[in-house]
Amino acid sequence: MSQFWYSEETASRLAEELLQQAGEHGRIACLSAPSVYQKLKQLESVRSDGVSAVLLEFDRRFAAYGDEFVFYDYNNPLCLPEDLLPQSFDIVIADPPYLSEECLSKVTLTVKHLTKGKILLCTGAIMEEHAGKLLDLKMCSFLPRHNHNLANEFRCYVNYESRLLS
């Protein structure tokens, strides 16, 4: 498994979207999206909205974030700590590690468990049909970029009214 880091502009745009959608004192779950989580942490010092974020990630190097890090393996999608209560996050961003229906189906279980409703999915354009079928998501016009260009076209999908749609 490889880590693909979003460009600075993309990480910022996604973090701003999450903060807006979470609302004051909201909770954000970053599922396999460490570059967005890191951007949220960077923005913490200039915000006073009380928003909190948790990173669910397979790469244990991110355990350096302490209690805000949760080890996550999509193969065990509901193997989560008891303190991650069902529907306890105002918005969940997910970036599944693989472009496969199997992976997205498993990640979907986690997303549905965690979210109160709002979902922002970042994955390949080839997953559009599955994103719609599994999570009722619509493709955004916003084009996320990575530090290194990916071979696959990458897109964002949401289930709410978003500035990323236009």
Curated annotation (Swiss-Prot):
Record's keyword annotation contains Transferase = yes
Q: Which UniProt keywords apply?
A: Cytoplasm, Methyltransferase, Transferase
What is one GO cellular-component annotation here? cytoplasm
Q: Where in the cell is it found?
A: Cytoplasm
Does the entry feature the keyword 4Fe-4S, yes or no? Answer: no
EC number assigned by the record: 2.1.1.-
Which GO BP annotation is one of this protein's? peptidyl-lysine methylation
Note the superkingdom of the native organism.
Eukaryota
Instruction: State the Pfam families in the record.
Output: N6-adenineMlase
Extent of the signal sequence: none
Q: Which reaction does it catalyse?
A: L-lysyl-[protein] + 3 S-adenosyl-L-methionine = N(6),N(6),N(6)-trimethyl-L-lysyl-[protein] + 3 S-adenosyl-L-homocysteine + 3 H(+)
One annotated GO molecular function is: methyltransferase activity
Give a short account of what the protein does. Protein-lysine methyltransferase that selectively catalyzes the trimethylation of EEF1A at 'Lys-79'.
Give the UniProt family note. Answer: Belongs to the class I-like SAM-binding methyltransferase superfamily. EFM5 family.
Q: Which PANTHER family does its entry note?
A: EEF1A LYSINE METHYLTRANSFERASE 1
Question: What is this protein called in UniProt?
Answer: EEF1A lysine methyltransferase 1
